[in-house]
Amino acid sequence: MKSKEKDILFLCQFFYPEYNSSATLPFDTAKYLANNGFSVGALCGYPKEYNVSGNVPLKETVEGVEIERIRYVELDRKKKINRLINYFSFTFSALMKIWKFKKYKSVIVYSNPPVLPIIPIIAKKFFGTKFLFVAYDIYPEVAYASKTLTSGDLIDRVMKFINKSLYKNVSHVISLTDEMKQFLLDNRHTLTSDRITTIANWAHEKKLMPDREAYERFGYREGQFVVSYFGNMGTCQDMDTLIHAAEILKDDDRVKFLIVGHGNKKEKVKSDILNKGLKNVQQLDFLHGKDFEQAVAISSCCVVSLEKGLKGTCAPSKYYSYLQGGHAVLGVVEKDSYLAKEINEEHIGFAVEVGDKDSLKDAILQMVEHRDETIKMGEKALWLYNNKYDYDIAMRTYKNMFSSVLDM
């Protein structure tokens, strides 16, 4: 058999120049590896929703990464059927490029969309290409918990079929947390601990000091306490608890709420704000660049939330942005989850149970009334990021893992 020409192919729906974390994290990894002795390519979707660069070429090389983009049907993701069409459309379009995999020694594939791993499974069978799997979310369990999938239906059976072959044939799995690693070991019995490495996500935000321009940009007064939520408002996020806490505090002029992002709960959040008359809540679309930097800078604390039943199946990427930004964290999460434990044990904020609006309100007021302590929480959050989640830590782990898998 002819020796393979290249080392690593990234297979993911989102990639450079898109600005969502599902694009920036793989691109960060790809360019780091390309600059550290690996030959790297990427097969990804043509950018649309998260792109501000205008038209981009179907093929180009960026920072040593050879990128090929695929056009596919991309519908509005608010409806479940549209999201399914997007998933299968991209996967089918990528499958039509299966010949490309023959050139690579390994493929790294991501869990979004969850049907995508079928392609490297096929590539391994026909070309002997090794593959690695990055588990951003664990399917189908995350879909069960968020009530977007019923056990036994067609999509569920498809996912289970893919999973059976995925975990049997994968060379290595990357979990985002040790909690997720344990979930995989408990529920994917063909996996062993030596085939799973925990590599947390990282962030791009730096700690910025807010200025008058930043406050005025978002309509706040200097000194107001701003509780911010950034990121996805999807099936996995509990937005109700935050909205209810904002409703309780709507007459407290010291506290303002800023909700920024996208997702299939975005319209419900918008409707709740309007129907409840929450003039203390400002909702904005996905921000990036200077707008996002200033929004983070004026935040006094930041909220991370997950619905019940998701322990071990996912990890919110914005949590790491909050830490790197040096912000105290309010976690609306299950009490025995890794997020709750870390927030409490590292003293970087407060964790409250999903649905407990009164405890969330109390935690916010505690931060408002003891701002020096809140600032100290933020300083501890930044220390935690630098010592546990920093970009360089993750990249060194990826480099060592690929060196081992490829016997380099």
Put a short name on every predicted segment.
Residues 46, 179, 199-202:
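Carbohydrate-associated surface elements
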Residues 55-59, 204, 208-221:
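A short helix/loop element that forms part of the nucleotide-sugar donor recognition site in Leloir-type
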Residues 118, 122-127, 153-173:
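Membrane-proximal helix-turn-helix segments that form the acceptor-binding/catalytic region
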Residues 1-66:
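N-terminal subdomain of nucleotide-sugar transferases
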Residues 237, 288-295, 300-323, 328-341:
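Nucleotide-sugar-dependent
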Residues 359, 366, 373-387:
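A short, well-ordered alpha-helix in the C-terminal region of glycosyltransferases
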Residues 260-261, 266-293:
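Nucleotide-activated donor-binding/catalytic signature segment of Leloir-type glycosyltransferases, i.e.
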Residues 203, 220-237, 243-246, 258:
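Conserved donor-binding/catalytic core segment of Leloir-type glycosyltransferases
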